[in-house]
């Protein structure tokens, strides 16, 4: 298994290692959460802690299939902990498989000298009553598939002579799922792997978890969202589309199904914001897919829809860097991404190529009604700097690889 140090995440997790807070890592299936647990173990060992102090359980491993309830898990841990002297470290992978897991975790936290790390593939892992039960005694870290920079760390050794442009083309179709490095990013095996991953997410994290009976409807909705990443649409417009396919579905049902997909981290919803009225708009959100390589594997057409895929890539990079993101509207103009991190704003427009005066005017003109002094970017595949009027133009590769934006 090829592993890289995911320092962006470790930097955020490191201050909480050894504290009483429960460390929770969430994200789409197979995005690298288990590897994060291994990286944390490595750091603990390097700090002088013996691996004999570790208790690790992967709840998708058949060896632990008997641990299906909070009581059985609690009994197992207390039995194993009795054999360990001093503080011990708990690593639970895919804990959502255990019924009422939060009761066990909270009991372990308050009654034993332990440091707890858990992963899960569902955004609702810590929602509502679960969060209340844990009493805010946790910190959550969302883990994403590889960024372009992380992809390069593993792809460069495989194709050392390829120019950066070719590397980016490979990323456009392969995406950032970590395991692809183990099959050397070869096209056919990668596509097969990603298709299998998609099926696992759909079956285990969406259908099974939410007890969905109409799988055909779910598949149609997923196909529609995948085809329309980065475009605004409403549940009503999707209901009309399905009606044309002889499926009559209430908009509320559609919204529920899309929410289940977002809970499984297959999609991310981006709300629209009226920048003049400073309010979130109630309809016509955009959706992006967790990994554009999955889109290529199950739907195809990433190069055909390259403008949408570039948007998808930039959006995920903004999330990785901890920005809160909305789509901005000012009058009749729309800004792809309005980004906020601790009160510091950033605006980003994404285009394929600035190949005509009309395109240049549209992309740069999106900022005409924005009067503040926060950084404004237009990002595209163009190689030459076309910055103007205080608006910065960046090649998308340079933008993605920059350590910081200012």
Annotate each PLM feature.
Residues 328, 352-397:
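Catalytic cores of nucleic-acid endonucleases
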Residues 36, 40:
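Hydrophobic positions on the alpha1 helix immediately C-terminal to the Walker A/P-loop
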Residues 185-345:
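Accessory nucleic acid-recognition modules appended to NTPase machines
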Residues 33:
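Conserved lysine of the Walker
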């Amino acid at each position: 298994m090829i592993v890289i140090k995911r320092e962006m995440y470790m930097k955020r997790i490191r201050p909480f290692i050894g504290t009483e807070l429960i460390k929770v890592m969430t994200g789409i299936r197979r995005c690298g959460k288990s590897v994060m647990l291994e990286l944390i173990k490595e750091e603990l060992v390097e700090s002088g802690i013996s691996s004999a102090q570790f208790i690790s359980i992967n709840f998708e491993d058949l060896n632990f299939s008997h641990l299906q309830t909070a009581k059985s898990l609690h009994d197992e841990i207390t039995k194993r902990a009795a054999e360990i002297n001093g503080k011990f470290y708990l690593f639970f992978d895919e804990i959502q498989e255990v019924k009422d897991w939060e009761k066990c975790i909270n009991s372990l936290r308050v009654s034993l000298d332990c440091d707890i790390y858990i992963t899960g593939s569902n955004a609702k892992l810590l929602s509502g009553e679960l969060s209340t039960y844990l009493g805010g005694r946790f910190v959550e870290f969302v883990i994403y598939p590889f960024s372009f920079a992380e992809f390069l760390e593993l792809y460069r050794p495989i194709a050392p002579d390829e120019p950066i442009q070719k590397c980016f083309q490979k990323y456009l179709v392969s995406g950032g799922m970590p395991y692809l490095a183990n099959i050397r990013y070869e096209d056919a095996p990668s596509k097969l792997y990603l298709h299998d991953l998609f099926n696992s997410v759909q079956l285990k994290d969406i259908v099974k978890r939410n007890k969905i009976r109409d799988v055909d409807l779910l598949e149609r909705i997923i196909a529609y969202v995948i085809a329309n990443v980065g475009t605004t649409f409403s549940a009503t417009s999707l209901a009309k589309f399905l009606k044309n396919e002889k499926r009559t579905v209430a908009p509320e049902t559609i919204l529920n199904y899309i929410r289940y997909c977002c809970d499984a981290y297959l999609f991310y919803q981006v709300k629209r914001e009226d920048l003049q009225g400073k309010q979130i708009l109630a309809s016509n959100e955009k959706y992006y897919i967790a990994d554009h390589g999955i889109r290529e594997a199950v739907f195809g057409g990433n190069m055909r829809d390259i403008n949408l895929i570039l948007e998808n890539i930039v959006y995920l990079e903004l999330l990785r860097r901890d920005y809160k993101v909305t789509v901005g509207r000012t009058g009749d103009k729309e800004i792809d991404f309005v980004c906020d991190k601790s009160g510091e704003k950033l605006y980003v427009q994404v285009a394929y190529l600035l190949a005509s005066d009309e395109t240049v005017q549209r992309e740069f003109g999106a900022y005409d009604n924005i009067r503040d002094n926060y950084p404004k970017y237009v990002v595209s595949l163009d190689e030459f700097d076309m910055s103007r009027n205080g608006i910065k133009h960046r090649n998308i590769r340079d933008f993605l690889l920059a350590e910081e934006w200012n």
